Regions:
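Catalytic-core signal marking the mid-to-C-terminal active-site face
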Residues: 14-16, 20-22, 28-47, 58-70, ...
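N-terminal intrinsically disordered, cationic/polar leader segments
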Residues: 13-64, 72-76, 82-97, 104-140, ...
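Short beta-alpha connecting loops at secondary-structure transitions
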Residues: 52-56, 330-336, 364-371, 399-411
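Helix-rich catalytic cores of soluble enzyme domains
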Residues: 157-388, 392
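Short, Lys/Arg-enriched N-terminal segments with co-localized hydrophobic residues
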Residues: 1-11
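Glycine-rich phosphate-binding active-site loops on the catalytic face of alpha/beta enzymes
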Residues: 385-405
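Flexible, glycine/charged-enriched surface loops at secondary-structure junctions
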Residues: 81-89, 100-103, 180-181, 240-241, ...
Length: 530
């Protein structure tokens, strides 16, 4: 073939698949129509990933035994701190722990025994039942970035986030096929008072999307508000009997459980709502510089946190989390997508499976200030390690920039597009009779080509994953269209998704009740930006 024939392969259609036996027809605009079909906006959501590939396990059973023994030793000899939380200390005393001041020392085996009542899998229900997700087992649920105070877009650059930005991200998440979850604090709406912004964020998730979402954890009272709003959305009986919220409970590593996070955990666990118990690991700052030492601390912290959730309510759903990064010893900045982070992520996955708990880690992590090559490399490393590590709930799966300080609109759609590769990788290798393609190999024979054979004609539309964002055109076409880079293409896609967004239907009475709840709560307290 001539070099230019490669473009014919990429733009292949039902008709061109038969060119070996049929005369080529004149151009009639079909290519443009097919390109439009490929890039058309859809509000279809792919089902959560069900892996058909093995997990990547780098730790031997003997090594895991050592980590486990060391973690138990830490809990028994050093202990963990439950600060400003007398009720927690009393619960630990009653369970058999040794409590001195705010230090809780947990006898060997006690925390692990308490963890046994936590479920290995659970369902988080969405208001649209077709978008409910099962967390645990071989499944992977993808959720967007969480927590940045800043946003960035190609036109306005970096700025503080607003509630309008938050609502825009929720719409983008709803329109993103490969994203299963609406997330939580996709960005921090700094134009809304701190004590009221959780209400507006929850309202956005509940009304602008029908995917599952996360509750507020910044104060126990806000956790209670989250549950009460869910009771309006789903009904009190449904919330009583089902899990409708997943909530991020960060541990103050090393080995400190603060009263704010534990207060939120206590509310959610008591109501049978799921909590991610997640050490916040920055190697060299909040954990040892060594992988083995970090794994030991992570396991000790998670054992204590999960055990405490079960003291609140045995059987409450929990996810074993690990936010993992290391520190640049020259600048003090966090680093992402590194080999050490991968080792820890793989290792924690093995420890989570030993405990029989769902696992949260990884994401679209990067330290870059722009959605550039550095961001792409670091993000690719982080996403792929999450898939291979057996992660069940991946927070920060799209939109993360600048070490989590920034939520980027362009990177959100770039990452969301790439999440499609995780879905396809997770399928594994098809070994069906059709996939073995012996008939195609016989048909083509030595020296032929597969472009016109029956097997290609039957399968070419679904044989290869294809980005909805990237540019695959020849240089001349790309140049004529403005020589746009990926960020420019992403900016166009952001606008297209926003312009074609269609709000999911919601019972008007429920919508009105949510608005009334939010208005009443806001009216009952003065604004506070502290």
């Amino acid at each position: 073939f001539r070099a230019t024939d490669s473009y014919w392969v990429i733009a292949m259609t039902d008709e061109t698949a038969q060119t070996a036996t049929a005369p080529r027809r004149g151009r009639g605009g079909g290519g443009a129509a097919r390109r439009a079909e490929r890039t058309a906006v859809s509000i279809e959501t792919a089902k959560y990933i069900q892996r058909n590939i093995p997990n990547y396990e780098i730790m031997t059973e003997e090594a895991l035994d050592v980590i486990q023994a060391n973690a138990e030793q830490i809990l028994e000899e050093i202990g963990v701190a439950f600060v400003d939380n007398p009720a927690a200390l009393e619960r630990w005393k009653a369970a058999g722990a040794e409590v001195t001041g705010e230090r809780v020392r947990i006898p060997k085996g006690l925390a692990r025994k308490l963890c046994e009542t936590a479920p290995a899998t659970f369902t988080q229900h969405a208001r649209n039942p077709e978008r409910s997700v099962e967390i645990g087992g071989k499944n992977l649920v993808l959720a967007p970035v969480y927590g940045p105070p800043f946003v960035r877009d190609a036109e306005g650059g970096r700025r503080y986030a607003t509630i309008a930005d938050f609502q825009k991200f929720v719409k983008l998440g709803y329109m993103s096929k490969w994203l299963h979850h609406s997330g939580g604090t996709v960005c921090e709406p700094t134009d809304v008072p701190v004590n009221k912004r959780h209400l507006d964020m929850l309202l956005a998730h509940m009304t602008l999307s029908d995917k599952p979402f996360m509750g507020s954890v910044t104060e126990p009272e806000r956790a209670q508000d989250s549950i009460e709003m869910c009771e309006i959305l789903f009904g009190k009986d449904f919330v009583r009997d089902n899990t409708v919220l997943v909530n991020l409970i960060n541990i103050n590593s090393p080995m400190t459980f603060d009263s704010t996070m534990m207060g939120a955990l206590e509310i959610y666990a008591a109501h049978n709502q799921a909590c991610i118990i997640s050490p916040f690991i920055v190697g060299g700052a909040m954990a040892p510089v060594s992988v083995a030492g970090t794994l030991t601390q992570v396991l000790a912290e998670v054992l204590a946190g999960v055990a405490y959730s079960q003291l609140i309510r045995a059987g409450a759903p929990v996810i074993m989390g690990a936010f993992v990064t290391s520190i640049d010893m020259n600048s003090g900045a966090p680093t992402f997508g590194t080999p050490e982070a991968a080792h820890i992520t793989y290792g924690v996955g093995q420890l989570a499976r030993r405990l029989g708990l769902p696992y949260r880690s990884a994401g679209s992590f990067c330290g870059s200030k722009l959605p550039d090559a550095q961001a792409a490399y670091e993000t690719a490393n982080s996403l792929n390690m999450g898939l291979l590590a057996g992660v069940n709930f991946m927070l920060h799966a799209c939109g993360w920039l600048e070490g989590g300080l920034v939520a980027s609109f362009e990177k959100f759609v770039m990452d969301a597009d790439q999440l499609g590769t995780l879905h396809h990788l997770a399928k594994g290798v098809d070994m069906s009779e059709d996939a073995q393609a012996l008939d195609a190999i016989r048909e083509v024979g030595p020296g032929g080509h597969y472009l016109g054979c029956a097997h290609t004609h039957a399968n070419f539309k679904t044989a290869f994953w294809r980005s909805d964002l990237f540019d695959y055109k020849p240089f001349e076409t790309w140049d004529e269209e403005g020589a746009r880079d990926t960020q420019a293409l992403a900016s166009i896609r952001v606008q297209k998704l926003v312009d074609t967004y269609q709000q999911p239907t919601l019972d008007p009475e429920i919508h009105a009740a949510l608005l009334a709840y939010v208005d009443a709560k806001k009216a009952a307290m003065p604004d506070s930006f502290m």
